[in-house]
């Protein structure tokens, strides 16, 4: 039986050595165990899928003891090294233990005797490992021999390799210090960190590192040495950062004792030099000022006390004719762009326009264009809000001619200056529009203008009583050519006083350039009479019969003129009504 059991242990030992070649012998074993684990969340034990034979073995290297459960359910075995941190507690038939990772397990034994025996063996092994660790701590504090190993303990290959690596790094560090003589500032930082590291090393290592420490001091005095990885950290730093660097160097010093320091030499400057431009930027930053964008609106309104809001530039049609001193309109950003350009741009130019002789409280966008452009006559529309625009077909029939004579001032109703026009309304007339029909002579035009002056002023005398006291000025000499499709060109030429041939919402007054006709001006023109708001609404309109009475002399001479004029008149009023409804 003993031979069979001995042969079985040898077979088991050979199987264990396949997993761990440092296993030397089997200390004890038991036939049937099962492993449980404790779940802290559920506060209960959970059975694992590990069960089989328990082996307690000895090893030739640290840790010197361990145990394993060879699982017969699957290929996952339990391997647990035994050290001083392992804690056991016996609860028959369970043996509880907690490892260094604070995981709690429980081993269930089929035989209670095996449970007691394994528990006693584990207690002895943990006590032995505790004594071994205490002895190793005392050996580190006591003087060592030349090879760094004490007489009364076995040789540890891993410890020898670790110490040999430290010796190699120290020698390599000394060689690199001699080969790089121009980096004295970081040497002081590295020496501060190295002294702290040497204090923590065992006394045997201090004896060996003492010559290298003296070597650093000697090379520092003669050549100036430093660690290669510390050199870029000092370039371009101010005094405040230099005071903080010794603490940082002492924290980074243990990382320098790594193998292959020359590989770190190539990689360290890349990470360290990233901080150099930031330090240089920090030193140059007070000399650099933030660029400030100065708009023309801020320069124009620099004398104003209120802070400007968003500046909306005027249209390209307006910009050439605006005076240089006129401030740009300031509107809040919540308004839409189209309403801002048509309604919210209300400003008074600093230089008085030649068309004005009285202060004006406010001007609309269209009236501003009319006053500042001497070669552009606005098309007056009865809609004071400026929302209705003439159509393309109407503009093809009505073309405004440029103003070319001396401009004089004359009182005008405020409602007559409110203009609204499209870009096509401001175009200049062609030279053909100034050519008069050959059938009309100068004498006929004088007679027609005289008769028209007497007829027009009679029905419009009652309108002067409702005149608005606030008046605008109006240019005296205006000319307008009325090309009609399908009819010969008819040019109505009268004086500035008796020039009412059309409704005020359609045309400007037309005058002749003859000085003889200007002398006959005796009464104000109906266009200069300012009608109140109630009369400018679409509800009070001149009927066809009233217009026929006013233009009776033209009806007798040319009946197509009245039809064409009334057609255009109704088109404008219809579109004004549609715009009001919208």
From Swiss-Prot:
Matches recorded under Gene3D superfamilies: 6.10.140.2030, Pleckstrin-homology domain (PH domain)/Phosphotyrosine-binding domain (PTB)
Modified residues (Phosphothreonine): 348, 401, 528, 531
Keywords: Cytoplasm, Hydrolase, Methylation, Nonsense-mediated mRNA decay, Nucleus, Phosphoprotein
Primary enzyme class: hydrolase
Function summary: Necessary for the degradation of mRNAs, both in normal mRNA turnover and in nonsense-mediated mRNA decay. Removes the 7-methyl guanine cap structure from mRNA molecules, yielding a 5'-phosphorylated mRNA fragment and 7m-GDP. Contributes to the transactivation of target genes after stimulation by TGFB1. Essential for embryonic development.
Segments for region (Disordered): 132-154, 172-214, 513-536
UniProt-reported outcome of changing residue 59 to A: Lowers decapping activity
Catalysed reactions listed for this entry: a 5'-end (N(7)-methyl 5'-triphosphoguanosine)-ribonucleoside in mRNA + H2O = N(7)-methyl-GDP + a 5'-end phospho-ribonucleoside in mRNA + 2 H(+)
Modified residues (Phosphoserine): 62, 142, 179-180, 315, 319, 334, 353, 422, 522-523, 525
Organism: Homo sapiens
Subunit structure: (Microbial infection) Interacts with rotavirus A non-structural protein 2; this interaction probably plays a role in the sequestration of DCP1A in viral factories. Interacts with rotavirus A non-structural protein 5; this interaction probably plays a role in its sequestration in viral factories.
Asymmetric dimethylarginine: modified positions: 376
Annotated protein name in UniProt: mRNA-decapping enzyme 1A
One Gene Ontology term, aspect cellular component: membrane
């Amino acid at each position: 039986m003993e031979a069979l059991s001995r042969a079985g242990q040898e077979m088991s030992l050979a199987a264990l050595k396949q997993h761990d070649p440092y296993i030397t012998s089997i200390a004890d074993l038991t036939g049937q165990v099962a492993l449980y684990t404790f779940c802290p969340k559920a506060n209960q034990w959970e059975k694992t899928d590990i069960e089989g034979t328990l082996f307690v073995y000895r090893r030739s290297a640290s840790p010197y003891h361990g145990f394993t459960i060879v699982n017969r359910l699957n290929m996952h075995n339990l391997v647990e090294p035994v050290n001083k941190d392992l804690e056991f507690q016996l609860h028959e038939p369970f043996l509880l233990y907690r490892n260094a990772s604070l995981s709690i397990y429980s081993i269930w034994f089929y035989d209670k005797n095996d449970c007691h025996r394994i528990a006693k063996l584990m207690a002895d092994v943990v006590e032995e490992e505790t004594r071994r660790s205490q002895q190793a701590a005392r050996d580190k504090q006591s003087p060592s021999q030349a090879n760094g190993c004490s007489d009364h303990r076995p040789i540890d290959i891993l410890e020898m390799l670790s110490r040999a690596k430290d010796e190699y790094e120290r020698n390599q560090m000394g060689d690199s210090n001699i080969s790089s003589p121009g980096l004295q500032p970081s040497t002081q930082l590295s020496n501060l960190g190295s002294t702290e590291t040497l204090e923590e090393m065992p006394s045997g290592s201090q004896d060996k590192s003492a010559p290298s420490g003296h070597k650093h001091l000697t090379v520092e005095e003669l050549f100036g040495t430093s660690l290669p990885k510390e050199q870029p950290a000092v370039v371009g730093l101010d005094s405040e950062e230099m005071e903080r660097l010794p603490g940082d160097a002492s924290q980074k010093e243990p990382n320098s004792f790594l193998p292959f320091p020359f590989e770190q030499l190539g990689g360290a400057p890349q990470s360290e030099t990233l901080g150099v431009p930031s330090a240089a930027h920090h030193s140059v930053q007070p000399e650099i000022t933030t660029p400030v964008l100065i708009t023309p609106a801020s320069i124009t309104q620099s004398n104003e006390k209120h802070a400007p809001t968003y500046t909306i530039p005027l249209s390209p049609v307006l910009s050439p004719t605006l005076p240089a001193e006129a401030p740009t309109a300031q509107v809040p950003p919540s308004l839409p762009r189209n309403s801002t350009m048509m309604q919210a741009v209300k400003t008074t130019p600093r230089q008085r326009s030649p068309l004005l002789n009285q202060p004006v409280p406010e001007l609309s966008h269209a009236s501003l264009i009319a006053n500042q452009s001497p070669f552009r006559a606005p098309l007056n529309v009865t809609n004071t809000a400026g929302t209705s625009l003439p159509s393309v077909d109407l503009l093809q029939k009505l073309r405004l001619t440029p103003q070319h004579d001396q401009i004089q001032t004359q009182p005008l109703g405020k409602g007559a200056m409110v203009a609204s026009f499209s870009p096509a309304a401001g175009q200049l007339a062609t030279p053909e529009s100034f050519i008069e029909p050959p059938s009309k002579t100068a004498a006929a035009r004088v007679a027609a203008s005289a008769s028209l002056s007497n007829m027009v002023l009679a029905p419009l005398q009652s309108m002067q009583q409702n005149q608005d006291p606030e008046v605008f000025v109006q240019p005296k000499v205006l000319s307008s050519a009325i090309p009609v499709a399908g009819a010969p060109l008819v040019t109505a030429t009268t004086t500035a006083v008796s020039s009412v041939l059309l409704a005020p919402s359609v045309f400007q007054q037309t005058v002749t350039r003859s000085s003889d006709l200007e002398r006959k001006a005796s009464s104000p023109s109906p266009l200069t009479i300012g009608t109140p708001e109630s009369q400018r609404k679409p509800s009070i309109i001149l009927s066809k019969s009233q217009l026929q009475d006013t233009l009776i002399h033209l009806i007798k001479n040319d009946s197509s003129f009245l039809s064409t004029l009334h057609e255009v008149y109704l088109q404008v009023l219809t579109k004004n009504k549609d715009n009001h409804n919208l």
